[in-house]
């Protein structure tokens, strides 16, 4: 990487998805990405952070291996902004009571679905047989099993994840769009076996722009990189969107920069481009 000590990126915010973007498909961090982030933050003064569907406990280990403690992170696909330096949720947008009723209707219509409800500091599991236990078990995440959605009602819900086979998830998507009050929440696809629900006007993009406002960063200096449909809103929201090489066509169609495959260091590609171009 060329040395450009005369450049100052302290008025820039660059945000990256984690799985399939910052990390490889094997969920390892390419040394090239780490080196590029260290250079962008420590040498050039830029703001870099992560935006993920993960909760705080799951994202923490990925956050702390990077030199980015001064910049809060986006958690729960935009439902929260967490300041790891203060260890404090500085913004949390909870799903409304109408949204909870929508989740109830979905589970009544598709009783075979597994449901994960993410609160600020816990994961609530309903009908957890395969997907839920695997998810919380992989990172040993704090969680609680609930016998029904009603048992989870007293909590503030950041996001709801419906788990099921791909053909069932497709039916869930179609059903939710037909419901009255569907405009009171925001839906997104995060994989072929998951469909997520958040509060209205809540996604990675809204939280990234809110974070930029907190940091006093102008729109023209906001950038983000992602690889899948749950990154779509974030990429549409920032000035400079980038797609990893393996991203679907729909993601590449809205990107201004096209990085290499995540296995080869897509984040480094993007940061090098920013340093060279701006």
Where in the sequence are the language-model features?
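Non-catalytic pre-domain segments flanking phosphatase-related domains
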Residues: 1-16, 35, 39
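Conserved acidic, metal-coordinating active-site core of Asp-based
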Residues: 112-225, 232-237, 246
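Active-site metal-binding loops of divalent metal-dependent hydrolases
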Residues: 18, 54, 226-228
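Short, structured coil segments at secondary-structure junctions
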Residues: 68-69, 77, 181-183, 237-238, ...
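Short active-site oxyanion
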Residues: 44-49, 69-71, 159, 220-221, ...
């Amino acid at each position: 990487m060329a040395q450009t000590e005369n450049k100052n990126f302290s008025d820039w915010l660059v945000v990256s998805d984690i799985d399939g973007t910052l990390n490889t498909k094997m969920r390892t961090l390419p040394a090239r990405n780490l080196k590029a982030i260290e250079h962008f933050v420590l040498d050039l003064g830029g703001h870099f952070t992560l935006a993920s569907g993960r909760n705080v406990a799951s994202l923490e280990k990925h956050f702390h291996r990077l030199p980015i403690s001064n910049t809060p992170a986006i958690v729960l696909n935009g439902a929260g902004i967490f300041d790891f330096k203060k260890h404090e949720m500085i913004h949390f947008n909870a799903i409304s009571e109408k949204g909870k009723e929508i989740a109830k209707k979905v589970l009544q219509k598709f009783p075979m679905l597994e449901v994960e409800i993410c609160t600020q500091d816990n994961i609530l599991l309903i009908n957890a047989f395969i997907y839920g236990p695997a998810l919380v078990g992989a990172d040993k995440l704090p969680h609680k099993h609930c016998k029904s959605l009603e048992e989870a009602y007293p909590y503030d819900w950041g996001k709801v994840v419906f788990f099921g086979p791909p053909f069932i998830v497709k039916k869930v998507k179609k059903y939710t769009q037909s419901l009255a009050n569907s405009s009171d929440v925001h839906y997104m696809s995060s994989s072929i076996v998951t469909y997520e629900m958040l509060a209205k006007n809540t996604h990675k993009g809204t939280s990234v722009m809110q974070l930029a406002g907190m940091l006093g960063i102008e729109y023209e200096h906001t950038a983000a990189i992602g690889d899948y449909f749950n990154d779509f809103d974030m990429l549409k929201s920032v000035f400079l969107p980038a797609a990893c090489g393996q991203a679907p066509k729909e993601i590449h169609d809205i990107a201004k920069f096209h990085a290499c495959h995540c296995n080869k260091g897509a984040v480094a590609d993007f940061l090098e481009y920013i340093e060279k171009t701006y």
